[in-house]
Amino acid sequence: MTVSGGEPLMQADFVRELFELCKKEGIHTALDTSGCVWNERAEALLGVTDLCLLDYKMTRSEDYLRYTGCDKAAVDRFLEELQKRNIDTWLRQVIVKGINDTPDSVRRLYGVAAAHTCVKKVELLKFRKLCVPKYENLGIEFPFGNIPETTDKDIRELLEGVKNKDRIN
């Protein structure tokens, strides 16, 4: 059972109860989160989480705050909690042209993964504009509207620019 968002940590009590029921039935639990929230409820939720898909959006603190409004230190703290609990983790990063689409950025992401034995996989995801209709319905301009979507070719070329690819899928 995978729970994603919005942000499931904002509903941590509900997700914990759901995961507890899953565990009683022998169902694997996966949490898809930004990791920006850490409190007692999030801590309790990790106690019944088998896998965390952690959206590690940026590798530089200033970019994290600028583009997400979240402090990268909070995400790093969440990752440390996953490490401490030995919860299998997949680091996932959406590649956005002109923002984090450089070999150096991917190398930094790989460095984060290499420093945490809980990280079993790194995924580079394509930036998509599937959310644009939601923004339009709300009358809000999509802040990344002028940025083209990332293609499979973009991801392949980016990976070719990174020497050590053994843990990057």
Language-model features and meaning:
Residues 2-130, 136-137:
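Conserved AdoMet/S-adenosylmethionine-binding subsite of the radical SAM
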Residues 120, 136-161:
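A structural motif corresponding to the C-terminal lobe/cap of the Radical SAM core domain
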Residues 164-169:
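Radical SAM enzyme core and accessory elements
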